């Protein structure tokens, strides 16, 4: 038993108990934390082992950054990182941190061409990568992409309840 583990009477460790009670933060909870100036813990991870440590440390959010192309895949820049590579890293992170809010970083070329591309690739992060949100860069020049993805999110969040009632 390591120094950081605390044994409970029935033999489980503190981490075993923590795994059972940890609940993934929702976007609403994260917004409330920000509004109330409560710290939000955030880490960048690209792999199962790192995500496992983040989950055990009760980190609020994990960013799966396109920098994983340099750190994990050996690229000289983030330019060559593909959607498939990002999805693979997101899946590994999700397996390691099933109860942590995961954000997928949309790589260069996955959203710049059209709103449709942005939505299609954002959906891949959500469906295939099992991410809770996506991140893209570009400020005002990508405002229409952000709006298209945001509109998708609103439909995605509100429709399942209606579908169950039909």
Summary of predicted features, one role per range:
Residues 37-40, 59-60, 98-102, 130-132, ...:
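Short, well-ordered coil/turn segments that N-cap beta-strands
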Residues 50, 76-145:
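Active-site beta->alpha loop and helix N-cap motifs at the rims of alpha/beta catalytic domains
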Residues 43, 52-71:
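N-terminal glycine-rich anion-binding loops that anchor highly charged ligand groups
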Residues 41-44, 62-64, 102-106, 134-136, ...:
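Hydrophobic faces of well-ordered beta-strands that scaffold small-molecule active sites
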Residues 155-166:
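Single conserved hydrophobic/aromatic residue that forms the stacking wall/gate
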Residues 2-44:
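N-terminal amphipathic alpha-helix/helix-capping segment at the start of soluble metabolic enzymes
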């Amino acid at each position: 038993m390591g120094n950081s583990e605390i044994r409970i009477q029935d033999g489980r460790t503190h981490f075993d108990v923590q795994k059972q009670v940890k609940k993934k933060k929702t976007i609403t909870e994260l917004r409330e934390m920000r509004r109330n100036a409560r710290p939000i813990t955030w880490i960048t991870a690209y792999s199962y082992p790192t995500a496992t440590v983040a989950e055990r440390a009760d980190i609020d959010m994990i960013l799966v950054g396109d920098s994983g192309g340099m750190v994990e895949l050996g690229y000289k820049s983030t330019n060559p990182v593909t959607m498939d590579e990002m999805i693979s890293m997101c899946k590994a992170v999700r397996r390691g941190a099933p109860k942590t809010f995961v954000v997928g970083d949309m790589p260069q070329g996955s959203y710049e061409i059209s709103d449709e591309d942005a939505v299609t690739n954002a959906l891949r992060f959500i469906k295939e990568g099992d991410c809770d949100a996506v991140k893209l860069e570009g400020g005002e020049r990508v405002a229409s992409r952000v709006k298209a993805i945001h509109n998708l999110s609103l439909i995605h969040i509100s429709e399942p309840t209606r579908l169950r009632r039909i």
